[in-house]
From Swiss-Prot:
It catalyses: 2 acetyl-CoA = acetoacetyl-CoA + CoA. It comes from Gibberella zeae (strain ATCC MYA-4620 / CBS 123657 / FGSC 9075 / NRRL 31084 / PH-1). The lineage of its organism: Eukaryota, Fungi, Dikarya, Ascomycota, Pezizomycotina. This is Acetyl-CoA acetyltransferase FG05087, mitochondrial. Its EC number is 2.3.1.9. It comes from the Eukaryota. Mitochondrial acetyl-CoA acetyltransferase that catalyzes both the formation and degradation of acetoacetyl-CoA. Seems not to be involved in ergosterol biosynthesis. Plays an important role in growth, morphogenesis and maintaining mitochondrial function including the response to oxidative stresses. Chloride binds at residue 414. InterPro entries: Thiolase, Thiolase-like, Thiolase_acyl_enz_int_AS, Thiolase_AS, Thiolase_C, Thiolase_N. GO terms for cellular component: mitochondrion.
Length: 430
């Protein structure tokens, strides 16, 4: 028998063994790891600047770098323990390649640290935190950084390469901020129109929205007066021809005339039935926030004395029809609570993103949170809504309010019809 014939015979015998069930499988037991607990060791945020305000010349990644650097310093975690950074960033036109990577390098972190940019619209920053938490829970990393960043003031206007530009004459441009940040792609109208739909579906009045907005501003003003944000703020040094200016305070909460709010015209529906105005909606802003997450071992070693040390108890995403995005948190929150093993009555403080006053009013109504501590220090209406940062910003603010033992929930809706929610418990030590 030739060599070729021997090989063929061996192959036939092998195939026959498969057919007759003689195939051999490994008897080694599968490797299994128990899910680990993930903790938050520190959280920091830049002030939130007004649209075309103090951060006009500071890119989103550079704002992110300030937040990352501050959070890392507060955490006491050695930088060599950090393996990955996740940063939310929504409006990436003209920001440059890999915004999260830029933030890592601008923060002075080692170039060996991997970075990933997350775009889940307004929920980007909170989604970034859940992704980092998953890596730690699965034992893939000891420590990670997560957060978000946005500079809405720097978003460019667009001219499509496929527009067939004329040799001469006028050229039509699109506002990148409206197109990629503020418009429902499917119905082709503003996010505010979705809020108007929520108002009608849940019988929310103009007066209720205005009252909520006024309370948001008053809460924010009192919070700043009481220095409630002092521990979470990472000042930003802005350079200009006149020298350097240190920005250490949110810019929008003072700019309100309460007597004018009830008389403002609706901003989105102008047929006489609209109720959503510039005052009872969030503002356009620039800012960043970041948190350091670690395993139980990291929390035990470096978490002592942390102002915000907390265990991540559960989190969830949920989706709705795009037009119903304002009430998506009401779907995500119950799932997150169930995964955390607690009920809503055990939650001490709730932080919902105030995209619109109607978002808080509708979700509070659906979830039965009337009378609960919701956004006690103000929210996106008064403090600002820097899209990619907002999810991690509300979590940062939540953590600085909780006392050891207390549970808190951060929840945020996002364009396209979805939301992310996260449950934490403050702990004194691990």
């Amino acid at each position: 028998m030739t060599v070729t014939q021997l090989r063929s015979a061996g192959r036939l015998a092998q195939l026959a063994g498969h057919v007759n069930g003689a195939r051999q499988f490994s008897t080694r037991p599968a490797l299994r790891k128990e899910l680990q607990d993930a903790y938050i060791l520190s959280a920091a945020r830049t002030p939130t600047a007004k649209f075309n305000g103090s951060f006009l010349s500071v890119s989103a990644p550079k704002l992110g770098a300030v937040a990352i650097k501050a959070a890392l310093e507060k955490s006491k975690v050695p930088v060599e323990k950090i393996t990955d950074v996740y940063m939310g960033n929504v409006l990436q036109g003209s920001v440059g390649q890999a915004p999260a990577r830029q933030a890592v390098i601008f923060a002075g972190l080692p170039k060996e640290i991997e970075a990933t940019t997350i775009n889940k619209v307004c929920a980007s920053g909170l989604k970034a935190v859940t992704l980092a938490a998953q890596n730690i829970q699965m034992g893939l990393s000891e420590a990670q950084i997560a957060g978000g960043m946005e500079n809405m003031s720097q978003v460019p206007y667009y001219v499509s390469r496929a527009s067939g530009l004329p040799a001469f004459g006028h050229v039509k441009m699109e506002d990148g901020l409206i197109k990629d940040g503020l418009t429902d792609v499917y119905d082709q109208f503003h996010m505010g129109n979705c809020a108007e739909n929520t108002v009608k579906n849940h019988n929310i009045t103009r007066e209720q929205q205005d009252e909520y907005a006024i309370q948001s501003y008053r809460n924010a003003q009192k919070a700043w007066e009481d220095k409630a944000f002092a521990d979470e703020i990472a000042p930003v040094t802005v350079k200009s021809r006149k020298g350097e200016t240190v920005i250490d305070t949110d810019e929008g909460f003072k700019d309100v005339k309460f007597d004018k709010i009830p008389s403002l015209k609706p901003a989105f529906v102008r047929d006489g039935s609209g109720t959503v105005t510039a005052a009872n909606s969030s503002t356009l802003n620039d800012g960043a926030s970041a948190l350091v997450l670690g395993s139980k071992a990291i929390a035990q070693q470096y978490g002592s004395g942390s102002r915000v040390l907390a265990k991540i108890c559960g989190y969830a995403d949920a989706a709705t029809a795009p037009i119903d995005f304002p009430v998506a948190p009401a779907k995500a929150v119950p799932i997150a609570l169930e995964r955390a093993g607690i009920t809503k009555d055990q939650v001490a403080i709730w932080e919902f993103n105030e995209a619109f006053a109607s978002v808080i009013l509708a979700n509070s109504k659906i979830l039965g949170l009337e009378g609960a501590k919701v956004n006690p220090l103000g929210g996106a209406i008064s403090l600002g809504h820097a899209l990619g940062s907002s999810g991690s910003r509300i979590l940062t603010t939540l953590l600085h309010q909780l006392k050891p033992g207390e549970y808190g929930v951060a929840a945020i809706c996002n364009g396209g019809g979805a939301a992310t929610a996260l449950v934490v418990q403050r702990v004194e030590s691990v």
